[in-house]
Amino acid sequence: MLRIDIITIFPEMFRGPFDVSILKKAQDRGFVEIKVHNLRDFTEDKHRTVDDYPYGGGSGMVMKPEPIFKAVKTLRKEKSEVILLSPSGDLFNQKIAEELSKKDHLILICGRYEGVDERVKKIITREISIGDYVLTGGEIPAMVLVDAIVRLIPGVLGDPNSLKEESFQWGILEYPQYTHPREFEGMEVPEILLSGNHKEIRRWRRKEALRKTFLKRPDLLEKVELTQEDLELLEEIKKELREEV
C-alpha cells in the first residue's frame, strides 16, 4: 500500500478533495493511506512560527528550515521519496506520475510565500512543478499529484481499460467520446461508432486521437513512438486538412 504524507500550513484545504470520488474509495479499499500534517505542529516556539523575513532584504516571507526538517525527519522511512512542490521543479507529467505510483512512501512538502529556505533542498529527493504559472502555495499542486498518482495504482479504477485509453497514457490525446442520444440539436454521433465493426472503430479512434494531438499538442508527437499505421494515418489527416483549406 502506498502511503502519502503531506506537510502544509493549511491542512483544512485537503478536507474536501480527499473525501470524495476515486480518492476516497482508494483509501477505503486500502490502496493508499493519505495523511495531512500541519507544519506548525513541528515548530518549537510559542507563536508556532513557520516563516521569516529573507536575509538580504526583499518582499514577502520565506518558510523556515527548522520545522520542515523536523517534519521530514519524523515522517521519513527508509525508502521515502521527499518531494518539494516548487515552481523551479521538474514539470509534472504522466511519466513522473507512473514512476511515483510505484513508490512505497511519498512525502509532499507544500511551499508557501516567497519560497522555502534553500537549505531545505538538502533533505528532499526531488522538486516538482505543475506548470509555468504562479500559485499561492503548494497545496493545489499536491492535490494534483495525489490524484494523478493514486488513479494509476492497480485496482483503484474499476475498469482497467479506462487507464489504457486515457489521454497521455499512450503519449497522445484521447479520441473524441460520444454517448446517447444518437442525435442532439442536429449533431450526430459518427456512423462508424454505430457500425459494430470493432476493427474500423479502433482505427477511427486512433486516427481521431492522432488528429486531435496533431492540432492541439503537436509537441507530443515528437516524443511518442509511432507505428507505421500511425504514420500512414497522420498522412491521411494532413491530406484531409489541406483539402479543407
Curated annotation (Swiss-Prot):
Q: Name one GO molecular function term.
A: tRNA (guanine(37)-N1)-methyltransferase activity
Pfam families named among the record's database cross-references: tRNA_m1G_MT
Q: What name has this protein been given in UniProt?
A: tRNA (guanine-N(1)-)-methyltransferase
Which enzyme class, named as a word? transferase
Q: Which PANTHER family match?
A: TRNA (GUANINE-N(1)-)-METHYLTRANSFERASE
Family, according to the entry, reads as follows: Belongs to the RNA methyltransferase TrmD family.
Q: Which residues bind S-adenosyl-L-methionine?
A: G111, I130, G131, D132, Y133, V134, L135
**GO BP term (any one):** tRNA N1-guanine methylation
| A single GO cellular-component term on record | cytosol
Keyword Transferase on entry: yes
The UniProt entry, under CDD domains, shows:
TrmD-like
Task of the protein: Specifically methylates guanosine-37 in various tRNAs.
Tell me the subunit arrangement. Homodimer.
| EC number, UniProt record | 2.1.1.228
- Catalytic function, reaction form: guanosine(37) in tRNA + S-adenosyl-L-methionine = N(1)-methylguanosine(37) in tRNA + S-adenosyl-L-homocysteine + H(+)
SUPFAM superfamilies named in the record: alpha/beta knot
Q: Per UniProt, which keywords does this protein have?
A: Cytoplasm, Methyltransferase, S-adenosyl-L-methionine, Transferase, tRNA processing
UniProt organism field? Dictyoglomus thermophilum (strain ATCC 35947 / DSM 3960 / H-6-12)
What's the main place this protein lives?
A: cytoplasm
Q: Where in the cell is it found?
A: Cytoplasm
